[in-house]
Regions:
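C-terminal helical subdomain
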Residues: 176, 183-184, 195-234
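The beta1-alpha1 cofactor-binding region of Rossmann-like NAD(H)/NADP(H)-dependent oxidoreductases
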Residues: 56-67, 99
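Catalytic loop of short-chain dehydrogenase/reductase
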Residues: 88, 95, 99-103, 125, ...
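Active-site Tyr-X3-Lys motif and surrounding loop/helix of classical short-chain dehydrogenase/reductase
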Residues: 67-71, 92-96, 100-107
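Conserved glycine-rich Rossmann-like NAD(P)H-binding loop of the short-chain dehydrogenase/reductase
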Residues: 24-40
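A short helix-coil junction within the Rossmann-fold of NAD(P)-dependent oxidoreductases
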Residues: 24, 75-76, 92-93, 119-128, ...
Length: 234
C-alpha cells in the first residue's frame, strides 16, 4: 500500500485523484484550504476512515505548508507520491490581464508547488521510490504554443511554463535524495477550470493519468508527459 499526498483535493481533478487512488487500496493524505467545508471529502472519509486523512494546507501560505509537513514528520509519516495539483486559471489575454491576477496565478500555480515540494522533502525521503507529479498543461508547452498560435489565458500559460521549469530544475536538485519529479498534463478536462466543452470527463482523465503513472519506468525523471503517458515537448 502506497501513501499519496494530493494538494487541492476538495474538488475537480484533485478530488477524483483522491477517490480513484483510495479505490486502489492506497492511503491518501488529501489536503485543502478549508477542510471544514470540504463536504465531498468528508463523505469520502466516511467510506474510507482508515485510509483517508484530510489535512489543512494552503499552498499560498508558507507557514501553512511548513506546519502541515512538520506535523507529518513529527508523526513519523512518509509519502510515496506527491501530486502538486492545486491550481487556478484566468482566461484573460494580453490586453485584459491585470497585474494582481497574474501575481495570484503565479503564487498558486508556481510558488505553491515550490513551497510544497521544498517542505515535503523529509517525508518523501521515507519512501523507497518517492515521486513528485506536478500537474501541468499543454498550454504551458512553449513548443506547442508556437505550433498552434492559440491566444488567451496568458497568465495561466506562463505559470505552467514556469512550473515545467520547476519540474526540470527540481528533478536535478532532488536527485541526491533519489526523489523523481515529473510534469503531467491531465488533458482538457470538464472541471470548473476546464469548462463544459472540454474533451474528457474528470473520471476518464484521472483513470488515464494513473494508468500511465503506473507504467512509468523507475528511472524516468525531469520529463513532461500527457494523460496517456506520452512525452510532451517543453
Amino acid at each position: 500500500m502506497n501513501k499519496i499526498l494530493i494538494t487541492g483535493s476538495s474538488r475537480g481533478i484533485g478530488f477524483e485523484l483522491t477517490r480513484q487512488i483510495l479505490r486502489k487500496d492506497h492511503f491518501v493524505f488529501a489536503t485543502c484550504r478549508t477542510p471544514d467545508s470540504a463536504h465531498e471529502l468528508k463523505l469520502l472519509h466516511n467510506q474510507y476512515p482508515n485510509r483517508l486523512t484530510i489535512l489543512k494546507l494552503n499552498v499560498e501560505d508558507e507557514e501553512s505548508v511548513q506546519s502541515c509537513f512538520k506535523q507529518m514528520e513529527q508523526d513519523g509519516e512518509s509519502i510515496d507520491t506527491l501530486f502538486n495539483n492545486a491550481g487556478i486559471i484566468d482566461w484573460s489575454n494580453l490586453e485584459q490581464i491585470e497585474a494582481i491576477a497574474l501575481e495570484k496565478i503565479y503564487k498558486v500555480n508556481l510558488l505553491g508547488a515550490l513551497l510544497v515540494t521544498r517542505h515535503s522533502i523529509p517525508v518523501l525521503q521515507g519512501s523507497d521510490s518517492p515521486l513528485i507529479v506536478n500537474l501541468s498543461s499543454r498550454l504551458g508547452s512553449i513548443e506547442l504554443r508556437g505550433g498552434t498560435k492559440l491566444g488567451g489565458a496568458i497568465a495561466y500559460q506562463c505559470s505552467k511554463a514556469a512550473l515545467n521549469m520547476l519540474t526540470k530544475q527540481t528533478s536535478i536538485d532532488l536527485e541526491p535524495y533519489n526523489i523523481r519529479v515529473i510534469s503531467q498534463s491531465p488533458g482538457w478536462v470538464k472541471t470548473e477550470m476546464g469548462g463544459n466543452e472540454a474533451k474528457y470527463e474528470t473520471t476518464e482523465a484521472v483513470t488515464m493519468m494513473l494508468d500511465s503513472l503506473e507504467k512509468l519506468p523507475q528511472d524516468k525523471t525531469g520529463i513532461f508527459i500527457g494523460e496517456d503517458g506520452k512525452e510532451i515537448p517543453w
